[in-house]
């Protein structure tokens, strides 16, 4: 069963009793079936009354009892920004009675009346459209003050307000876009963390007002459906009625700050809890901004999420981001290590291939050198053999003793020259077996040179040294009386070989001095 609110007596029956009717016909005495009890109706803003508007009276007035809002500051404050009006009505002027001021918080329009001269003047006054479209009467006085405020003074006041909130409370004012939806943007910023979700907040608020129309309609003088349809527009300003609805909807108190460190008004929800309130700041009596506490997370509080902890999502996201970053970094490092290992292997392969190529080229050069050297050696041996044959005729007339004494002076020179010119290290590495001194014939030397075509640099130093030593030794050391003809041939061959060695050394020095083009 629904208990309807009490009807108010017509204005004509008690023209000066609006103040009394405000207390006797308070809307908080109205109750609804199945609804939760309300501690107070939507509060109205406290402001010093204007003498010109104190005598005004609006028809069909419904005023909440005074003192229903928690006020924490002094000074004039408007409850909303101007909004478009969808209905109009005529008002009559009454020069007496301060209680005739229409102070209801839900008035969607207001007609300012011009009083005639004299405090007791009465009569009909023409209506003006100066205040048309405002949500309540307390916007008129503050709006007039704002228009005459110096811009520099207003800027200093805004700066002081932000600095005071930051130093004393640690709060930060977040600027909202000034497009008529600033109140819903401020609430969306603190509930959803994104002011662009103001349309969702507005839709939920209007739906909540429609579901509780039997309560909130008592504070709206115009048709409640028309009021809701107008408030659904994105460019329509919000008011304290919407603040009360959002405080109940999100079950979070709504605190309003205006140029002070303490809230001038607080809207409470149905149930008291320890949730962080929704804080908004009111600027120039026309704009709302969001006031946030950077040290305490409040996003998501009031949405009815089970087991929701403010800030836990950010921590989880941070941990997930750190874990993902570490995994990505580890994978990147492993990939780089593999790339470096691959480069190292490829480098080793390239080095090995280059070394093998250079070694092969060096081997080819050595083969070419070895192929050219046998021809030079055979030519030298043939010239040495011819010289030896011509020298045999001269030595044939001599006795062995004379030949030995004649040939002996030459041997020290050979031995000394051999000692002065030692063999090169490269030739020592390729030494073969020295030829036997017992068979020193020219034919044997030629055949031996032909057989060693692949290795022509056979060192003859051991054989020459042996022959030189044998020339200095006495024949009696070997059990002989005198040297035979073989000894003469051996000495001739030794001289030929010495000549060949000198030629080879000169050619080697010539090749070393000139660049190797092969």
From Swiss-Prot:
According to its UniProt entry, one GO biological process term is: negative regulation of canonical Wnt signaling pathway
Q: Ranges for the OTU domain?
A: 171-294
> Per its UniProt record, what Pfam families does this chain match?
OTU
Q: Region annotation Variable-loop: residue ranges?
A: 231-241
CDD domains in the cross-refs: OTU_OTUD5-like
Start and end residues of each stretch annotated as Disordered: 1-147, 391-450
Segments for region (His-loop): 282-287
Q: Which reaction does it catalyse?
A: Thiol-dependent hydrolysis of ester, thioester, amide, peptide and isopeptide bonds formed by the C-terminal Gly of ubiquitin (a 76-residue protein attached to proteins as an intracellular targeting signal)
Q: Key word Hydrolase present in the record?
A: yes
Residue ranges, compositional bias (Low complexity): 79-95
As one GO molecular function, the record gives:
cysteine-type deubiquitinase activity
Active site at 179, 182 (nucleophile), 287
By its UniProt entry, which PROSITE patterns does this protein fall under?
OTU
Q: What class of enzyme is it?
A: hydrolase
Where does the record place the region Cys-loop? 176-182
Q: Which UniProt keywords apply?
A: Hydrolase, Protease, Thiol protease, Ubl conjugation pathway
Q: What is its EC number?
A: 3.4.19.12
What this chain does, per the entry, is described as: Deubiquitinating enzyme that may function as negative regulator of the innate immune system. Has peptidase activity towards 'Lys-48'- and 'Lys-63'-linked polyubiquitin chains. Can also cleave 'Lys-11'-linked ubiquitin chains (in vitro).
Q: Which family does it belong to?
A: Belongs to the peptidase C85 family.
Name of the protein in question: OTU domain-containing protein 5-B
